[in-house]
Structure formats: C-alpha cells, structure tokens
Amino acid sequence: MTMIGQAEGLVALQPEGWPAPKGYANGMMGRGQVVFVGGQIGWDAEGRFADGMVGQIAQALRNILAVLAAAGAGPQHIARLTWYVTDMEAYRANLKPLGRAYREVMGANYPAMAVMRVIELVEPAALVEIEATAVLPE
C-alpha cells in the first residue's frame, strides 16, 4: 500500500500494482474532526437552479464549500464525495467540461469518489446531488 501526498492531514491511499486513478483517490486516510455535508444540489442560496448538468455540478460543489467554510474547512479537507446523478449518459457525455468545472471549484483536490445513477431526486429540477465527508486535522 502506497500513501500518496499529504494535504491538511489527509493521505491518498494507493494499493501496490494498481493503476493510478485519474481525478479521484482509491482511498483516503486522515485523523481529526469529521465533517459530514448533507447532499447538496445545483441551486444557489435563493433556490435558483444552474443550467444543465455541468452548471448544477459546479453549483453543488460551491454549496459543499460553503458548508465546509462554516466548519473552518476547505476543499483540501474533503476525504470523500458521493455523487447521485439522474442522467448517467449526460454525465458521461460531459466528462471534460465536468472536469474543468470541478477543478475551477475544488482545485487539484481529488478525494475518494463514487458516482451513481438514481431514478430521481427530491427536487424535480435537480440533476445531481453530492454528499461530502471532510476531515479537519487535529
């Protein structure tokens, strides 16, 4: 098991012999206070949805950062993101612009991630919901 990098008390885990992940980590390890961010969708503080999959993902990520800021945390503290998308084809068709939007909001912070398709979300106009788990160092 190789431990890659160390940002703000978090270490990315990489099993020996596995290909390097691109845009995510296979695992993360950290010690400190854990912050759980409930599912964030692509609307702003006034309840207005961003346009399209890429816009909603960028807004959901900004919403995650707003919650983390309330705990004194930032994107470098995120250990895990779980993405729920209503249209996997739209997600796959937009991987490059999604990657750009992700880096614009989160920088080069790539935690453990999972993406799954769901039939629908509670808010009918929502195309994505993202949960986050962060660790603030001791």
Segments from the language model and where they lie:
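N-terminal presequence-like segments and the immediate start of the first folded domain
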Residues: 1-79, 85-138
